[in-house]
Amino acid sequence: MKKYLIIVFFSFVSQFASAEQKDSFLVSYTLVKTHTQKSLKAMWKKNKLPTMFAPIRHDVDIYEITYRGKWVDGSMRLASGIYYVPKEVKKPLPTMVFCHGTEIFKGRKISDNDAQQGISLGAATSGYYSLFPDYFGIGSGEGNHLYQHAESEANAVIYMLYAIDELNKKLNAKTNGQLFLTGYSQGGHASFAAHKYLEKLNDPRFQVTASSPMSGAYDMTGDQTKFMFQKYPRPFYLPYLLVSYQEAYKILNTSNIYAIFKSPYDTLLPNYFEGERKHGLGDLNSILPEIPKDAIKDDYISEYTNNPDFTFTKRLKENNLFDWKPKAPVQLCYCQGDREVSYLNSVKTYEEMTKNGKTDIKLNNLSPRLDHNTCALFAVMATVNFFDRYKYHGKNPKLKDVPPFKKMLLGILKKRIEKQYVSSKSDKAYF
């Protein structure tokens, strides 16, 4: 009898251990650096960032993490990201996920000079546990990144949340259950995809408190498509989409997606999309024609234009994010002067969601003049203000406006940047 009980006991322990292993998504975590409040103040001063808009309240530990997440074929793949952990925390804090903009270069490093990483760092020191997912195929993850692909974007966020839930137990980091999602440009699409999939998943651990997608292409088959047929500052978007959707969906009956491109692009593009992807977006942009469609063979352009059942068009529709009804509050940030991601993406999303009965949704036009790059700063500020209302006031926030003095300073700063933008028309891409 005693021997039988021992066997049963070890059988139970073995089954429990197997279940634990099966449900484990965290692969590795490494503390890379710690920022003290003193070092953050020096960084803020160097970058002329007022603490009024980005308060410094905590030292921050920065972790490089790897985790396992579900790929489009159902298999589990390695992904990576950065986790910013506030220190000397006296009470449970909310979690914020920031999804970064378009990137093709795989070798992401933790850097104090990266503007997007700075958003996550700023959130952490102000009082959020802050996640910066790389997406699949960027950083130290496996495979290739799928551009503007809602499911893989969402899974990169969701499985990182699972991994961080495990890591928080190891770090004794206590969250208050609030979850905020945001991102800029592609990150706007990715964060909104994560919102949609999280609500569908309905995991009680990860209920979305609010989301604030910024300047994203939520309507993949609408106004955004006009840029394919005119001079466009970022022609790399089109081949990036085609290569990504071929890997995800096999949109063409060919093993060589590059056969869709005219010469010399059919031989140049593999150098940028295959292998280790060591080139940046600027390098890719420099080899492409000003009008994106001019890189594609005419018969494929004709198929896209005239055949509503073209597989590429169908797959684009599947990745639209405007026609659903979120449960959690939403703010859509954009600038009307954006010539890269049409502001009508946000307008249409707002209109369709209100038709679907969504009431707690805000359409926030931050400037009629600022473009895709210069809009980002003000979109982030508006997002922080939006999230802080829920952070401090829970499910029923006091939806007060920005304090008058702070609003005045924001107005002065915006006018100054608008004036500089009109005079310089910088083409540098930040997001």
Residues of each region from the PLM?
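Gly/Ser-rich "nucleophile elbow"/oxyanion-hole loop immediately N-terminal to the catalytic nucleophile
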Residues: V85-P92, Y162-T182, L201-F206
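Short beta-strand/loop motif that positions the catalytic acidic residue
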Residues: Q331-D338
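Short alpha-helix in the alpha/beta-hydrolase fold that links the catalytic acid
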Residues: A194, A328-P329, S342-M353
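Accessory cap/linker subdomain of secreted extracellular hydrolases
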Residues: M214-D323
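Catalytic-loop region of hydrolases
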Residues: E20-K90
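Short, surface-exposed "cap/lid" segments of acyl-processing enzymes
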Residues: V72-S80, Y84-A123, S140
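C-terminal catalytic histidine-bearing segment of alpha/beta-hydrolase fold enzymes
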Residues: T225, Y304-R315, N319, E340, ...
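Alpha/beta-hydrolase active-site loop
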Residues: Y147-K169
